């Protein structure tokens, strides 16, 4: 049996289902490119039949990614498989992942069919998907609660039908490691054609056991683990990719298994997903939490000074978290910035040097010292800008009356290149700025969530503002970054306004198509 574990990332499919606001196509592509750099073998990037937006994002990613296999999800229905195949057809290499429920409660209560009917649907779906590709994965949804005889039968028939990967999900995070490992062991003992497929696992974290269950399965012969960055996903989340990768690396002597993950990209990828998805990483999160390499106990600190491996089983550098605290000032030249970006793993094509250096100088004049995390924050914000932004914040001035609690804000916004200046009052400077921006853009949206976080350390740290806004029953996520909280808040709102504008244009386009079809049918 191979000692290579295939890493199947589903951040952009299962992970995205946990978000309050959907990612844009551009944001999904950013994450896909980061996953490719990370070295994932397979990335599941969407459910094409679910919406035109998901179809487009799958197609865009499939067209761009070259070094990882792109996968799309489909139910055991021909229309789903058709949509997946069509969206993936532009890829160099792709996988169709089809699934159906197999547990008694799902078969009887959700599908309202007999197990034999479900078995037939599964076989037909796999055979149909094989018309488009040899790489077909089949999942037994809720396998963790499926009677073992039925599960063995389903796996055997799916392999006979042509599935080359069989996924065994613990869909509701119900099993414990000994139990889940036992399921995998039983499949290897009882399914006669098990050697013709890779056995995969997809574990959820409802009881906090997703990683432990996945490792138990791997020890019993599973050779694909489905996971997400930072463990994001439905309900309590999914198996965490970074934890699986570092378990395999750190305990190689015990497990004797490898995966193709470039561990030095873990920190960077984790931060990107956290920012784009507006999902903070808890401080004590294994591998990527801010406390993961912190030592506060005096005994621990003393041990660390004598020998780092007394209390560290891996190094921050091993996941790409550089301890180099070299600071840069406005006197630092372009070559210094370029060197620091290279040290952090960025290629020249990942950012615009002219734009980055200009922003760096502006920030250095404000802060005095600029650190690595500042540069990464600037690159992230630059990546959020769109060439076709309708609204651009040019200038803002705020006056606050501390005695009355009333603030006045004046903003100048370029709308399609034409400057518009508006002023408004509000209950505090942020509220005033938001009211002024609403006037300038002639749009009123409902802010449902506002979050402020520091990007960096000390009193001069950059402030990142994330907002979730509701407009026409759709949710949008905006982000802003500045040394001033009010400015960062204004940037976040303008970001949302541009997303809303593009959503309106798409809606108008769809409506026009609908009208043309109606006229054509008359």
From Swiss-Prot:
GO terms for cellular component: cytosol. Pathway: Amino-acid biosynthesis; L-leucine biosynthesis; L-leucine from 3-methyl-2-oxobutanoate: step 1/4. Residues 5-267 form the Pyruvate carboxyltransferase domain. It comes from the Bacteria. Residues 392-522 are annotated as: Regulatory domain. It holds the Pfam family HMGL-like. Mn(2+) binds at residues 14, 202, 204, 238. Gene3D superfamilies: 1.10.238.260, 3.30.160.270, Aldolase class I. Its cofactor is Mn(2+). GO terms for molecular function: 2-isopropylmalate synthase activity; acetyl-CoA C-acetyltransferase activity; manganese ion binding. Its EC number is 2.3.3.13. GO terms for biological process: L-leucine biosynthetic process. It is found in: Cytoplasm. Keywords: Amino-acid biosynthesis, Branched-chain amino acid biosynthesis, Cytoplasm, Leucine biosynthesis, Manganese, Metal-binding, Transferase. Homodimer. Catalyzes the condensation of the acetyl group of acetyl-CoA with 3-methyl-2-oxobutanoate (2-ketoisovalerate) to form 3-carboxy-3-hydroxy-4-methylpentanoate (2-isopropylmalate). Belongs to the alpha-IPM synthase/homocitrate synthase family. LeuA type 1 subfamily. This is 2-isopropylmalate synthase. It comes from Shewanella frigidimarina (strain NCIMB 400). The gene is leuA.
């Amino acid at each position: 049996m191979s000692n290579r574990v295939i890493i199947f990332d589903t951040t952009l499919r299962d992970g995205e289902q946990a978000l309050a606001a959907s990612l844009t196509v551009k944001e999904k592509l950013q994450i896909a490119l980061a996953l490719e750099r990370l070295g994932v073998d397979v990335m599941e990037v969407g459910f094409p039949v679910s919406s035109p937006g998901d179809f487009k994002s799958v197609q865009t990613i499939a067209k761009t990614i070259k070094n990882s296999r792109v996968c799309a999800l489909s139910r055991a229905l021909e229309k789903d498989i058709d949509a997946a195949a069509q969206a993936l057809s532009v890829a160099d290499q792709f996988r169709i992942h089809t699934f159906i429920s197999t547990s008694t409660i799902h078969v009887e209560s959700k599908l309202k069919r007999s197990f034999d009917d479900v078995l037939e649907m599964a076989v037909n779906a796999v055979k149909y998907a094989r018309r488009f590709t040899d790489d077909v994965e089949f999942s037994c949804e809720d396998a963790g609660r499926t009677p073992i005889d039925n599960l063995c039968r389903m796996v055997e028939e799916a392999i006979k039908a042509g599935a080359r990967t069989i996924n065994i999900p613990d869909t509701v995070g119900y099993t414990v490691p000994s139990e889940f490992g036992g399921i995998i062991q039983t499949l290897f003992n009882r399914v006669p054609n098990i050697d013709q497929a890779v056995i995969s696992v997809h574990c959820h974290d409802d009881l906090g056991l997703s990683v432990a269950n996945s490792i138990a399965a791997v020890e019993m012969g599973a050779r694909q683990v489905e996971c997400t960055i930072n463990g994001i996903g439905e309900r309590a989340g999914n198996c965490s990719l970074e934890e699986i990768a570092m378990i395999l690396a750190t305990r190689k002597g015990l497990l004797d298994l490898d995966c193709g993950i470039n561990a030095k990209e873990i920190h960077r990828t984790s931060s990107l997903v956290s920012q784009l998805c507006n999902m903070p990483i808890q401080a004590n999160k294994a591998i990527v939490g801010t406390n993961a390499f912190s030592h506060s106990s005096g005994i621990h600190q003393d041990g660390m000074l004598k020998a780092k491996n007394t209390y560290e089983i891996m190094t921050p550098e091993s996941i790409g978290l550089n301890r180099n605290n070299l600071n840069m000032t406005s006197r630092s030249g372009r070559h210094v910035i370029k060197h620091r970006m290279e040290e952090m793993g960025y290629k020249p094509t990942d950012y615009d040097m002219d734009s980055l250096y200009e922003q760096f100088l502006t920030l250095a004049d404000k802060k005095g010292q600029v650190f690595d995390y500042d540069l990464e924050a600037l690159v992230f914000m630059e990546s959020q800008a769109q060439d076709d932004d309708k609204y651009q914040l040019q200038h803002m001035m705020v006056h606050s009356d501390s005695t009355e609690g009333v603030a006045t804000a004046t903003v100048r916004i370029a709308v399609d290149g034409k400057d518009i200046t508006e002023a408004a009052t509000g209950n505090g400077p942020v509220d005033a700025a938001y009211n002024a921006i609403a006037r300038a853009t002639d749009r009123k949206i409902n802010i449902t969530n506002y979050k402020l976080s520091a990007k960096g350390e000390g009193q001069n740290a950059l402030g990142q503002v994330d907002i979730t806004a509701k407009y026409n029953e759709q949710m949008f996520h905006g982000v802003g970054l500045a040394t001033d909280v009010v400015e960062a808040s204004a940037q976040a709102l303008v970001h949302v306004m541009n997303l809303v504008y593009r959503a309106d244009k798409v809606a108008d386009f769809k409506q026009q198509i609908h009208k043309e079809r109606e006229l054509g049918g008359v």
